[in-house]
Amino acid sequence: MLNTTTNPFKPSAGHLPPVLIGRDLVLDDFREGLDNGSGAPGRLMRITGARGIGKTVILTEFRNIAERRGWQTISETASAGMAQRLLSRLQPQKGSFSFSFEPSVSISNVGGSLGGVHYERASIPLTLREAMSARLDTLEKRNVGLLVTIDEAQAADRADMVAIATAVQHLISEDRNLSLVFAGLPSMSSKWLNDNVMTFLRRAQPERLGDIPLGEVSNAFVDTFHSSGIILKGEPLRIATQATAGYPFMIQLVGYHIWRVVRRNHDLWRYCCFCGWWFVVELLRQ
């Protein structure tokens, strides 16, 4: 009998699965970055990998880790106007503002900022750097910081990336309690890291997400199904594990459909576990 009526596997884009397997090293790198303070490698990170490999899931878990420590987090997905949206979310809660975004600006009395983004209250310009600094002033009084994550970074406009990279570079040089993590397809590296204007991003700690070792997949299947009152072992377990090829999305998809069919066919599954493996074979063929 199943111990839960909710399928524990989540084969949908970006959904955080109940158990995140095979990513301990990258998660530990991020935690150490938060622990070790400004300038720690894990606070400036770039994550690459194929579609479906779990980049969005990792960013979600990073935000969860930071929020459990009291940090404020801002999540963005790269598209036109990303820097403008980031600035809007950083604006003070009071006042009347006029927003503008320019790929290249020159503002008197404000330090040089490539790809400057600013909004105005009266005649006082506020750059993205200043907006982030103002938010950090508040957060650092409570000994917490700000995490910004950017997904699909390979699709970002150059002006947006220049504005964000420039602001973050200045703030890191000032030892502010800030972390930036950006993720994208492998093409992101050649697109942004070879841009002379954004050499700062080359110093981001690289984390390449690959397939999950099959041994870890097998263990995760055993534990996850067992928590639902299902015994998956022997040949059925081997076939299910092999079918995933260690690909994170396939782990969720295979697990989801096995759990779904088991829920509908309790007696048949009981026969499969003790007398054969054809049940899983037929399921995976479907």
Regions flagged by a language model, labelled:
Residues 1-43, 89-92, 106, 173:
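A short, basic N-terminal segment
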Residues 46, 60-82:
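Conserved catalytic segments around the Walker B and adjacent sensor/switch elements
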